[in-house]
């Protein structure tokens, strides 16, 4: 069932593109990252992009709910039944953003109840806009369909978050990479015919996954926990908005192989 019209989706695409331009202008200027209570970084771009997205989206969709990373009480997060919620990560990859590197992204997911329906992940520095509608996933308006029977060799890529490098065993002969953005890593899996991406492994928060999750599914990829369980966003809400374990976004049909690649040892 169609929830948003093509005009609505076009509006959201234009808004995230505008937000990306704003973030790039701030990055190219003189800014100074600050530390949050958990010691993670926050920049002016995180705050300004989030403010802009909330303002524009609430103007288009009166009554829509919001879950976002900055200045947000995780204990107040709700995904109301049959209601729309915009889940926002204004700068996914603030650390690489603050290093003046290009591999950060802006992530926006539109949920109905606890189900993520539409995703938008924009990497201005890489020139990549991933999104989906009710039929397909797209990269820069080109339809994406994963190759579920992809060949795995020394040039195949998997993406792993930095915190896992010291707490895992890996059994894999290809490339292991980290670009600094959960949403971008996950969306790259949807483009595996071109970039040879097999999987992204990560935990993170709802806002890190919200934009990428529906894109991956519409491209024909899959997301599940490493123990085989389905990702339950209502359960993640009850866990302080964090996924309850490590999940894999993957493009190959053989999940047993995908999860055999890494063993978390901590």
Predicted features along the sequence, with ranges:
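N-terminal subdomain of lithium-sensitive/metallo-dependent phosphomonoesterases centered on the IMPase/IPPase/PAP
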Residues: 1-91
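Residue-level signal for inorganic ion chemistry
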Residues: 19, 23, 46, 57, ...
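Generic detector of well-ordered alpha-helical packing
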Residues: 47, 70, 90-93, 124, ...
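Conserved residues at the C-terminal ends of beta-strands
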Residues: 69, 122, 200
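DPxDG-like acidic metal-binding loop motif
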Residues: 79-138
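A structural micro-motif at secondary-structure boundaries
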Residues: 139-146
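An extended, acidic
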Residues: 148-266
């Amino acid at each position: 069932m169609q929830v948003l019209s093509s005009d609505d989706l076009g509006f959201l695409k234009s808004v995230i593109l505008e937000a990306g331009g704003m973030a790039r202008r701030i990055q190219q200027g003189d800014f100074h990252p600050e530390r949050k209570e958990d010691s993670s970084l926050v920049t002016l771009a995180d705050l300004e992009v989030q403010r802009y997205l909330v303002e524009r989206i609430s103007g288009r969709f009166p009554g829509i709910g919001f879950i976002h990373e900055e200045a947000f009480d995780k204990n107040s997060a709700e995904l109301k039944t049959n209601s729309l919620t915009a889940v926002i990560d204004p700068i996914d990859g603030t650390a690489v953003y603050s290093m003046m590197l290009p591999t950060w992204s802006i992530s926006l997911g539109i949920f109905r109840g606890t189900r993520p329906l539409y995703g938008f992940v924009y990497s201005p520095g890489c020139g990549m806009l991933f999104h989906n509608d009710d039929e397909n996933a797209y990269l820069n308006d080109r339809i994406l369909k994963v190759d579920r029977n992809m060949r795995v060799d020394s040039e195949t890529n998997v993406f792993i978050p930095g915190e896992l490098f010291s707490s895992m065993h890996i059994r894999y002969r290809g490339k292991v990479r980290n670009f600094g953005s959960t949403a971008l890593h996950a969306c790259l899996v949807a483009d595996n015919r071109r970039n040879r991406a097999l999987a992204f492994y990560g935990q993170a928060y709802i806002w890190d996954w919200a934009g990428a999750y529906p894109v991956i599914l519409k491209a024909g990829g899959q997301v599940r926990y490493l123990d085989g369980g389905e990702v339950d966003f209502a359960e993640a809400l009850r866990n302080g908005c964090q996924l309850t374990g490590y999940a894999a976004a993957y493009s190959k049909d053989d999940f047993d192989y995908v999860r055999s690649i890494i063993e978390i040892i901590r």
